[in-house]
């Protein structure tokens, strides 16, 4: 089997800044679980990168899994110690780098240097939203994401897409911009968290759950408007809505609504820092998981 390398830069940043796992992070974590026993870790900054030894990689992978699977309870000095004790090296010629996070690919010297040194890059594309729906993203995100796609299309040896729609979007972008799509596969995503075994629901009565960072494209505003109308008609007997997700970008109006307890009469609850153990319980007993975007 060819040597496998995993870029875990984004996951390590999440630990340093004590962040909960996003959807992209959960995908990267799944690859760490699958390949971690034999793979080596790669870290990158502004296109410069290095690999660490197998032993150091296992320590890093263990810290990563412990942090994201144990509700964020890990001391950062353990991560720092694993990094500082790591001998840095280049990725071996003939190796395969699996890049699952988008982050860092905007610096084209990263993938270019790997290609020149006989390393195959397999790049995972999660979406093209910054290009197809730029108004829902921060200023400058479209330009960064376009650089990532151009790097992947011109210098990677393979593409993983999380859906047929994503792959079709990428193929359309490639055709419009003079690129050839490398060999590609659709790898659909499994659930990112275990459903709890608790037989008791977290709250009494029927409830619905919405999970995701609070930002315009997730359409929380639409759901809250629907719930407001139900509360106006049904009062406190309206079904409950549980919103799980941290505060994101350009969402002050949604946050103001979520904090307006008088408006909701106890029917809407917001959990900005929900651990996975609790999330599993919420999902198990919910009537439905809502995705209005």
Task: Identify the residue ranges that each predicted region occupies.
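Carbohydrate transferase catalytic cores enriched for Leloir-type hexosyltransferases
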Residues: 1-293
């Amino acid at each position: 089997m060819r040597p496998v390398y995993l870029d875990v830069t984004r996951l390590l940043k999440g630990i340093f800044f004590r962040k909960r796992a996003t959807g992209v992070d959960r995908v990267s974590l799944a690859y760490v679980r699958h390949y971690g026993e034999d793979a080596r870790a790669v870290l990158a900054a502004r296109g410069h990168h290095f690999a660490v030894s197998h032993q150091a990689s296992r320590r890093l992978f263990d810290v990563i899994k412990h942090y994201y699977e144990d509700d964020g309870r890990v001391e950062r000095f353990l991560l720092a110690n694993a990094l500082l004790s790591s001998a840095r090296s280049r990725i071996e010629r003939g190796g395969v780098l699996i890049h699952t996070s988008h982050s860092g690919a905007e610096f084209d010297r990263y993938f270019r240097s790997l290609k020149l040194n006989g390393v195959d890059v397999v790049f995972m594309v999660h979406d093209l939203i910054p290009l197809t729906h730029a108004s829902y993203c921060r200023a400058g995100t479209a330009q960064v994401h376009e650089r990532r796609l151009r790097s992947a299309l011109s210098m990677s040896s393979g593409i993983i897409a999380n859906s047929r729609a994503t792959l079709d979007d990428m193929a359309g972008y490639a055709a419009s911009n003079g690129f050839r799509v490398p060999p590609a596969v659709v790898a659909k995503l499994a659930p990112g968290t275990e459903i709890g075994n608790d037989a008791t629901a977290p709250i009494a009565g029927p409830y619905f759950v919405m999970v995701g960072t609070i930002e315009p494209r997730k359409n929380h505003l639409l759901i809250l408007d629907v719930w407001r109308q139900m509360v106006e008609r049904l009062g406190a007997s309206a079904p409950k809505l549980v919103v799980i997700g941290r505060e994101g970008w350009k969402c002050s109006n949604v946050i103001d609504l979520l904090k307006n307890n008088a408006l909701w009469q106890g029917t809407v609850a917001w959990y900005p820092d929900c651990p996975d153990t609790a999330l599993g319980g919420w999902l198990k007993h919910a009537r439905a998981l809502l995705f209005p975007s």
